[in-house]
Amino acid sequence: MRVVKVKKTVVIIGGGAAGMSAASRVKRLKPEWDVKVFEATEWVSHAPCGIPYVVEGISPTEKLMHYPPEVFIKKRGIDLHLNAEVIEVDTGYVRVREKDGEKSYEWDYLVFANGASPQVPAIEGVDLKGVFTADLPPDAVAIREYMEKNRVEDVVIVGGGYIGLEMAEAFVAQGKRVTMIVRGERILRRSFDKEVTDIIEEKLKQHVNLRLQEIVLRIEGKDRVEKVVTDAGEYRADLVILATGIKPNIELARQLGVRIGETGAIWTNEKMQTSVENVYAAGDVAETKHVITGRRVWVPLAPPGNKMGYVAGSNIAGKEIHFPGVLGTTVTKFLDVEIGKTGLTETEALKEGYDIRTAFIKASTRPHYYPGGKEIWLKGVVDNETNRLLGVQAVGAEILPRIDAAAAMLMANFTTKDAFFTDLAYAPPFAPVWDPLVVLARVLKF
């Protein structure tokens, strides 16, 4: 008996990490299916995390695409539409604005992978020449072109999150005078506890005019930006970066009646299915659950975004797989000071109602007798009732292996005893015999 293969059409809105992961996975499992991707820009499988390094000049703009469009079209058989903006979504079809007009396309399965957009403050002057966001590859192109055509000496960055910090480094590395204006009492305050951010702030203040607890009132200039005015002063500006957060692009999902979750992003289950049959969501537009708390969270980061797309594509093609959730594992740096975390901070754990204990330690990345050792600080958060490790933060040098190991521990529900007895590698050129992460577990007690 011959098996008849039923060809399905999968439409994916968004050609970023999640969208192309979903598209590639469907084509791998169901090569005979018609997979269409509509990307509003000319950039596909792009890496927004690389924008600061293009602005700094250490990476060419074209490298922000992981694969060129031809790879997806010719090698993977994906029907990729660039500069194609989806303007309407309804049951069974989407309407798309393309270069040659508007067209409608039918779908059997639909994936929202249309990401997030910058939250631009509603103040005067944000539309002046020389004022930018740093969200997509075209932003990197525009910033570089502006710097080449105009004299830029004074840069003002509005916002003290990851993007603000990384963009500050990009301009400091080029010898620019940088002012960072932060509304809150410290940088990265939503992601890290104070004793951790204090260390990177100390480094930041050596190179940047850091203005905390100031509110930007307006941006002024005639033909182009000239200064930024806050409730505490004025700052000369030849270029301004608005790094004041992002929001999920949920407008198209609302057209279809898709449920929006409590975080403001699209609600999804473990298969990345939305509340509407045969409709999925992945990446920065979708919310998920936190591995530790089980609560709904919106964590717009590249690694989970890619995996969400993979999971969505797998389930659409009939291979069931569940997305377990996120820990919010992150890492960044300012010059030679790195900062990262995984799991819950002390602030977050207390907010969730945990009875906790914490430890904050300073260690070296090498034995005292081996050259090249650098300082590293670690903070751990533990549930008093179960001794389960809830979160780890790190700042200083060579933090990545500690944060990654801690993330694996959290995924496996490690206690402090489990962490202490983890058989980590040791040799003097790489680490001390008592690795800082093991020392942290010992100080946290078990």
From Swiss-Prot:
List cofactor names only.
FAD
Cofactor binding note of this UniProt entry: Binds 1 FAD per subunit.
Q: Which domain of life is it from?
A: Archaea
- The EC number of this protein is 1.8.1.18
Task: Note the Pfam families from the entry.
Answer: Pyr_redox_2 (PF07992), Pyr_redox_dim (PF02852)
Binding-site list for CoA:
R28, S45, H46, A47, P48, C49, H66, Y67, R76, N306, K362, W434, R442
Q: SUPFAM superfamilies under this entry?
A: FAD/NAD(P)-binding domain, FAD/NAD-linked reductases, dimerisation (C-terminal) domain
Query: Which residue positions are annotated as catalytic?
Result: C49
Q: Which reaction does it catalyse?
A: hydrogen sulfide + NADP(+) = sulfur + NADPH; hydrogen sulfide + NAD(+) = sulfur + NADH
Q: Give the GO molecular function terms.
A: CoA-disulfide reductase (NADPH) activity; flavin adenine dinucleotide binding; NADP binding; NADPH:sulfur oxidoreductase activity; protein disulfide isomerase activity
Q: Which residues bind FAD?
A: A17, A18, E39, A40, H46, A47, P48, V86, D284, A302, Y426
Q: Which UniProt keywords apply?
A: FAD, Flavoprotein, NAD, NADP, Oxidoreductase, Redox-active center
What is stated as this protein's family in its record? Belongs to the class-III pyridine nucleotide-disulfide oxidoreductase family.
Any idea what job this protein has?
Answer: Catalyzes the CoA-dependent reduction of elemental sulfur (S(0)) to produce hydrogen sulfide.
> Which protein, by its recorded name, is this?
NAD(P)H sulfur oxidoreductase (CoA-dependent)
